[in-house]
Regions:
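C-terminal nucleotide
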Residues: 2-15, 21-25, 29, 57, ...
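Short beta-strand scaffold segments in enzyme catalytic cores
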Residues: 15-18, 46-50, 158-161, 165-170, ...
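Short capping/connector residues at structural and topological boundaries
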Residues: 24-25, 40-44, 119, 125, ...
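Short amphipathic alpha-helical segments
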Residues: 68-75, 126, 143, 275, ...
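Charged/polar, low-hydrophobicity segments characteristic of intrinsically disordered regions
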Residues: 78, 82, 159-171, 230-234, ...
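Gly/Ser-rich oxyanion-binding loop with an adjacent helix/lid
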Residues: 90-193, 203
Length: 404
């Protein structure tokens, strides 16, 4: 008997223009458009294997080796149902000889190679990998934008992980959500020297989940309404132009402004929401001072911080300046050196140690033992990948190879 199985991986994306707030909570339709950078899967990714079999008695999912119940009406169930519907409409209805996989239950195993729910977008890469593996299993002849419509219903930001490079999630205007989808602004090959330095400030679960937090903001923040109407549309256009022109200075300015406003909107929520902590704020001070020196010398910024709904910093920087940024973080957070894999060989045979650029005012922040737990250096990357059987997460019987 045939085995119907496929494995795919999907990347993390980090927004430069933030998504925060839904106009429809069931379909996950956003109050504003957003734009993100896809990070390289060689460093951060979710991998998912999906199998369909007539002998399976129910749909089942394991996340990082632990079974996760697929609750009726949940986002997970919605995504699986929608993918089965696409299989029927796009394949089985058109080709009567195609196996009726849409009628089989599925078993799905998913694994993240980074901490889940820690301010790194695990739900985005997770739902993108889920949809991509089911699309491969079902042999769907559809575009990433079409798949993004389904991934969006799992986790809004997941729709942006269906492409590599620079990706916009267009908010759309239709009530059914059919125009709220992801489009690629530029592929990863357009700006290959753009790198990202992730400072892992805290890998514990956060206090206020994004889902709960953003709806409280929609209900109570007047600043969010100003942001939606007057700020985001202009920023979306400006940052898209900056990306097309590879204008790092403009890209950095807009990215930092939008991160600041997102956290201002969280603070404007009643009661207020705090995602950044004192370590996060210290990193902002370091990047502001680093850019002050850069502007004095060259007239342009050289780094951009951004924070999602958590304390971790993501710092965008051109490849030639990455070492200065890592040096800076290690100068103020020396413990981070223990959890920094130097995958790009910045230090070659040198010892990893902190330093600041000349002209830097070291009084802008205090040294902080244990403040940054680790540093991840990565770069811009591609969209979902279909993987071979040797990377499958399910064994011959259709159960996870690794259980927690």
């Amino acid at each position: 008997m045939s085995t119907y199985q496929a494995t795919a991986s999907a990347p993390v994306n980090i927004a430069c223009i933030k998504y925060w707030g839904k106009r429809d909570t069931k379909l996950i339709l956003p109050t504003n458009s957003s734009l993100s950078v896809t990070l390289d899967q060689d460093y951060l990714k979710s991998t998912t294997t999906s199998r369909a079999d007539p002998s399976f008695e129910k749909d089942q999912l394991w996340l990082n080796g632990t079974e996760d119940e697929i609750k009726p009406g949940s986002r997970l169930e919605t995504c699986i149902k929608e993918m089965k519907r696409l299989r029927k409409v796009e394949v089985e209805d058109k080709d009567p000889s195609a196996p009726k996989l849409s009628t089989y239950h599925v078993r799905i195993a998913s694994y993240n190679n980074f901490p889940t729910a820690a301010g790194l977008a695990s739900s985005a890469s997770g739902f993108a990998a889920l949809v991509s593996s089911l699309a491969a299993l079902y042999k769907l002849p559809v575009s990433p934008s079409t798949l993004s419509l389904i991934a969006r219903q799992g986790s809004g930001s997941a729709c942006r992980s269906l492409y590599g490079g620079f990706v916009a999630w267009e908010q759309g205007t239709k009530a059914d959500g059919s125009d709220s989808l992801a489009i690629q602004i530029a592929p990863e090959s357009h700006w290959p020297t753009l790198h990202a330095v992730v400072c892992v400030v805290n890998d514990a679960k956060k206090g206020t989940s994004s889902t709960a937090g953003m709806q409280r903001t929609v209900e109570t923040s007047p600043l969010l309404q100003h942001r939606i109407k007057h700020v985001v549309p202009q920023r979306m256009a400006e940052i898209s132009d900056a990306i097309r022109a590879r204008d790092f200075d403009a890209f950095a300015r807009i990215t930092m402004q939008d991160s600041n406003q997102f956290h201002a909107v969280a603070l404007d929520t009643d009661p207020p929401i705090f995602y950044m902590n004192d370590v996060s704020k210290a990193i902002v001070a370091l990047i502001v001072e680093y850019n002050r020196v850069a502007i004095e010398k060259t007239g342009k910024r050289k780094a951009a911080y951004t924070y999602d709904a958590g304390p971790n910093a993501v710092i965008y920087v051109e490849q030639e300046n990455v070492k200065e940024i890592v040096d800076l973080i290690l100068q103020y957070f020396p413990d981070a050196a223990a959890n920094f894999k130097d995958v790009f060989n910045l230090y070659a045979n040198d010892q990893k140690k902190g330093a600041v650029v000349s002209g830097f005012n070291e009084a802008v922040a205090q040294k902080w033992e244990g403040g940054v737990k680790g540093i991840i250096h990565t770069k811009i990357g591609d969209g979902p990948r279909t993987l071979g059987e040797n990377e499958a997460l399910l064994d011959a019987s259709g159960l996870p190879k690794k259980l927690a």
